[in-house]
Amino acid sequence: MGYLKRFALYISVMILIFAIAGCGKGNETKEDSKEEQIKKSFAKTLDMYPIKNLEDLYDKEGYRDGEFKKGDKGMWTIYTDFAKSNKQGGLSNEGMVLYLDRNTRTAKGHYFVKTFYNKGKFPDRKNYKVEMKNNKIILLDKVEDTNLKKRIENFKFFGQYANLKELKNYNNGDVSINENVPSYDAKFKMSNKDENVKQLRSRYNIPTDKAPVLKMHIDGNLKGSSVGYKKLEIDFSKGGKSDLSVIDSLNFQPAKVDEDDE
C-alpha cells in the first residue's frame, strides 16, 4: 500500500514538472510568434523596396480602415533621416519627408536640418520646401549654401535603394511589447556584409566599423492601422551618449485636408 502511494506521488510530481516545462515552451512559442508577426507586418511595405521610382506609390494601395472617407485614395508618407551626436553634446539630424497624395498624384514635403543641444539652448530647426515631379526632387525655397542645395536635390530615401525582402532570415530578435498602447519593438543584429549596411556607409559619414542593429518599431495594431505608424532604425551607435543612426518609415494614411500642415 505504501509503495502505491509513493508511486502515485512520483507520477503526480512528474506530471507537474512536464506541465511547468510545457508552459515555458508555450511562452517561447508565443514570443517567437510575435517576432514573426512583427516581421510580417513590416513586410507589407518593405517588400516594395527598393522603390526606385517614387511615383509608383501613386498606384500602390495600402491598408485601409474606417478612418478613410469614401472616395479617398489615401496618401503615402515616406521619411528618412540621418542622426548623429554633435560637438555640443546634443544631436543633429538631417533628412526629408515627402507626402504622396494618391488622389491628386502630387508629392510635397520638406527637407529638414535640426540641431538639438544638450542644455541651455533651444534647438535649431530649418525646413526647406520641396516637391517631386517625374521622380525628381525639386527645391522650392531659396538656399544659398551650395552644398546643402546639392544634398537636397540629390537626396535619396532609404526605401529607394534598400532591399529588405530577406527580412524573414533575421532571427532570434530581442522583442518587447506594450499591450496598453499597443506598441511592438524588435531588434536584430546586422552584419557589415549586408548590402543595406554597405549602401548606408557609402552615402553617409559613419566613422565606426561597428556592425549596426536593426530596430523595428510599430505603434498600433500589428495587422494594420491608419492611425498608427511603423519605423525602422539602423543603429550604428557605440553606446553611452553616442548616437549614430538612420531612421526610415513608409506609412499609409488618409489624405491630408490641409497640405500645408507639415
Curated annotation (Swiss-Prot):
Main localization category: membrane
Membrane topology, record value: Lipid-anchor
Transmembrane residue ranges: none
InterPro entries tied to this protein: Csa (IPR007595), Csa_sf (IPR038641)
Lipid-anchored residues (N-palmitoyl cysteine): C23
UniProt signal peptide: 1-22
Annotated Gene Ontology cellular component terms: plasma membrane
Signal listed as a keyword: yes
Keywords of this entry: Cell membrane, Lipoprotein, Membrane, Palmitate, Signal
UniProt subcellular location: Cell membrane
Similarity comment: family membership: Belongs to the staphylococcal tandem lipoprotein family.
Protein name: Uncharacterized lipoprotein SAOUHSC_00402
Organism lineage string: Bacteria, Bacillati, Bacillota, Bacilli, Bacillales
